[in-house]
Structure formats: C-alpha cells, structure tokens
C-alpha cells in the first residue's frame, strides 16, 4: 500500500462553534448566541422569582458582526449557547476587489476576509494607500469572520 499524505486545512482543532452556559452565569461584556447570532452582552438584568416560575434573565446584546441590537428573556436556570470567539492579528499585504490579503504568523496568506464597511474600511484603505504597514485584528465566531480594528505595525517588524 502506498503512503498517503493527509493534509487538514482547519484553523481550529475541531472545536465546537458554541458551548452551553447557564443564564445566571452569563456576564456583561461576555458573549452569547441570540437568534442564532454571536453577540456581546451590553446589559443584563434579573427579575425576581414569581409565584409561578423561575427568576428571569433579560439580556440586551449587540451582534458582533452586524452591530444590531438583540434582546432575550430566559429563565435563569436555562442554558444558553455561548459562541467560541477568537481574535487574531494579521499583517495586511494588499487590498484587492473588496477583500483583505493578510499574512498569517506562519507566512501563509489569507484572502477571504472582506474589507470592513463604513469608516473603519475607509480609514484602513486610505492608510494602506499611504504605504503604512498595518496589522489587522480579525474576530471569528460561528463560521464568520470580520476585521474589527487595525493598527500601524511597529517599525522594523516587517
């Protein structure tokens, strides 16, 4: 039998997209899944136990990719999904056709992240056009990725 080379092109080690957490354990500035969207909790309040039921947790959260506000009301004993959110920094190589061309830490290129919309994307484009070396922060959760910030690379790092 011939030896076969197996290559696996995954960035995560098969980690689940989300994990369960009891409502009462969620915290402000933490993450939660509401209506199948990864969100950052901006406000939460708890109502007292009623005559017929459990204490309720009222969550107000912002979608980490779209910025839309979402709300949820759940019994404090229920489990909610929490997204696995990761942040990585990449060096910006090029901006082409609405996508960022980024270099990973091991020298590979990553070309599947869109230029962010609005002011962030405009500033990123103009500073790149000025010839600045930029480091872009990419946030990823539940199979989606987006550039959320950038900074100028320290001189002499490239």
UniProtKB/Swiss-Prot annotation:
It is found in: Cytoplasm. GO terms for biological process: positive regulation of translational elongation; positive regulation of translational termination; translational elongation. The modification Hypusine is found at residue 51. InterPro entries: IF5A-like (IPR001884), IF5A-like_N (IPR048670), NA-bd_OB-fold (IPR012340), Rib_uL2_dom2 (IPR014722), Trans_elong_IF5A_hypusine_site (IPR019769), Transl_elong_IF5A_C (IPR020189), Translation_prot_SH3-like_sf (IPR008991). Its main location: cytoplasm. Lys-51 undergoes hypusination, a unique post-translational modification that consists in the addition of a butylamino group from spermidine to lysine side chain, leading to the formation of the unusual amino acid hypusine. eIF-5As are the only known proteins to undergo this modification, which is essential for their function. Pfam families: eIF-5a, IF5A-like_N. One of its GO terms (molecular function) is translation elongation factor activity. The keyword Protein transport does not apply. SMART domains: eIF-5a. Keywords: Cytoplasm, Elongation factor, Hypusine, Protein biosynthesis, RNA-binding. One of its GO terms (cellular component) is cytoplasm. Belongs to the eIF-5A family. NCBIfam families: eIF_5A. PANTHER family: TRANSLATION INITIATION FACTOR 5A FAMILY MEMBER. Translation factor that promotes translation elongation and termination, particularly upon ribosome stalling at specific amino acid sequence contexts. Binds between the exit (E) and peptidyl (P) site of the ribosome and promotes rescue of stalled ribosome: specifically required for efficient translation of polyproline-containing peptides as well as other motifs that stall the ribosome. Acts as a ribosome quality control (RQC) cofactor by joining the RQC complex to facilitate peptidyl transfer during CAT tailing step. This is Eukaryotic translation initiation factor 5A.
């Amino acid at each position: 039998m011939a030896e076969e080379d197996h290559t696996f092109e995954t960035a995560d080690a098969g980690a689940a997209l989300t994990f369960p957490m009891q409502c009462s354990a969620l915290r402000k500035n933490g993450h939660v899944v509401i209506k199948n969207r990864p969100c950052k909790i901006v406000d939460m309040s708890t109502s007292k136990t009623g005559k017929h039921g459990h204490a309720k947790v009222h969550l107000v959260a912002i979608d980490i990719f779209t910025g839309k506000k979402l709300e949820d009301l759940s019994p404090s004993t229920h489990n909610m999904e929490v997204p696995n959110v990761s942040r990585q920094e990449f060096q910006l190589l090029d901006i082409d056709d609405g996508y960022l061309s980024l270099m990973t830490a091991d020298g590979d290129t990553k070309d599947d992240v869109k230029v962010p919309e609005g002011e962030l994307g405009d500033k990123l484009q103009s500073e790149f056009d000025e010839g600045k070396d930029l480091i872009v922060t990419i946030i990823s959760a539940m199979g989606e990725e987006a550039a959320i910030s950038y900074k100028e690379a320290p001189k002499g790092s490239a």
